[in-house]
Amino acid sequence: MIGDLLIFGTLLVNAGAVLNFKLKRKESQGFGDESRAPATGDNIREFLLSLRYFRVFIALWNIFIMFCMIVLFGS
């Protein structure tokens, strides 16, 4: 059970880290757009952009998970 959750979380973070889409903010269309609160899409976009900076740590985490799969979760 815990092994499945670790694999699920690892795959989810990997998918977010390797996205190569151009994630840009929407251009402001008029007056008053600067004062609005960030939307959910903006928050997701910022999170995915921040994941790109942690690719080295994500790679190390993958190696750790592979080690755990062999040593701890293997039969």
Curated annotation (Swiss-Prot):
The keyword Transcription regulation does not apply. Residues 18-53 are extracellular. One of its GO terms (cellular component) is membrane. Residues 75 are cytoplasmic. This is Small integral membrane protein 7. Disulfide bonds: none annotated. The keyword Transmembrane helix applies. The chain crosses the membrane at residues 54-74. It is a single-pass type I membrane protein.
